[in-house]
């Protein structure tokens, strides 16, 4: 009798175990391709410890069944990623995200036209480079979900570890091109390929007026430091050799340096990604 009872308990335990395994979510692999905004997820010390965690860490906290690989390359353009695509060791994955374009804009790289994408004309343009990247990802896994992420808006950037590394924001054009055009190109590619687009430029709520609370600069007339909100700081000189860092901790809003997301900004990006990755 006791032996029969033990057997029933054993069978019940097996059934419960199989049910539990059945309800466990399948592990999903995700390769995140990008520039410094992606790279910093594993290098938060390079933010002057102003960021605690990037968007991939935040996504996997909400979706623990996802395992990510960081293919963020600091300072790289879409054109460089495309040119080096065979040397990056990109693995086969269930999901790929491509978050590029802001460095192409600042570097004056030609956006090109949709024809460059459609006709696969090569890596001389951003449009053509996206075709190269997407083709590579499809060769690795033609069933993978590919997510395109547009560049986010930016204001005046000053690198916290080297003030001479600075750039104006997307409130004006660079070499006759607007960052908004690069975002629109990515939307166009997404629509053509029927890919999911996370449109940070237009739909994240991260706009020129909330990327930083102010920029601290010397008043040109008095020489006294003053906190200038956007757009009042546009055109006021910044001397990287003599001026203090223009974005003290109190200036942090959606970014901590005018370009790279703060914890608040990374949370916005992660939440937008969770909505599409969680489907």
Annotate each PLM feature.
Residues 1-28:
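Bacterial Sec-dependent N-terminal signal peptides
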Residues 25, 57-62, 82-279:
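Alpha-helical cap/lid subdomain in secreted, periplasmic
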Residues 22-72, 84-93:
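Serine-esterase "nucleophile elbow" of acetyl-processing enzymes
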Residues 40-51, 70-76, 110-122, 225:
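Acidic/histidine-rich helix-loop elements
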């Amino acid at each position: 009798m006791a032996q029969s009872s033990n057997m029933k308990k054993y069978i019940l335990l097996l059934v419960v175990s199989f049910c539990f395994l059945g309800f466990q979510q399948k592990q999903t692999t995700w390769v995140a391709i990008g520039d410094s905004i992606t790279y910093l997820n594993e290098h938060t010390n390079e933010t002057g410890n102003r960021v605690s965690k990037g968007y991939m860490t935040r996504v996997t906290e909400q979706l623990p069944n996802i395992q990510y690989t960081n293919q963020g390359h600091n300072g790289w353009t879409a054109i460089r990623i495309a040119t080096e695509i065979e040397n990056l060791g990109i693995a086969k994955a269930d999901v790929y995200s491509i978050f590029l374009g802001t460095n192409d804009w600042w570097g004056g790289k030609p956006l090109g036209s949709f024809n460059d994408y459609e006709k696969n004309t090569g890596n001389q343009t951003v449009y053509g480079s996206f075709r190269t990247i997407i083709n590579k990802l499809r060769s690795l896994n033609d069933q993978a979900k590919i997510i395109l992420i547009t560049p986010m808006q930016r204001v005046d950037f000053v690198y916290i570890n080297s003030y001479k590394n600075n750039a104006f924001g997307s409130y004006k054009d660079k070499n006759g091109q607007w960052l908004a055009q690069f975002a629109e190109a990515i939307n166009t590619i997404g629509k053509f390929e029927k890919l999911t687009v996370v449109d940070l430029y237009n739909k994240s709520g991260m706009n020129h007026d909330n990327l930083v609370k102010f920029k601290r600069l010397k008043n040109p007339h008095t020489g006294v430091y003053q906190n200038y909100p956007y757009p009042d700081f546009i055109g006021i000189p910044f001397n990287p050799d003599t001026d203090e860092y223009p974005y003290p901790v109190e200036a942090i809003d959606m970014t901590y340096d005018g370009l790279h997301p703060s914890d608040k900004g990374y949370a916005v990006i992660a939440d937008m990604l969770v909505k599409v990755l969680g489907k």
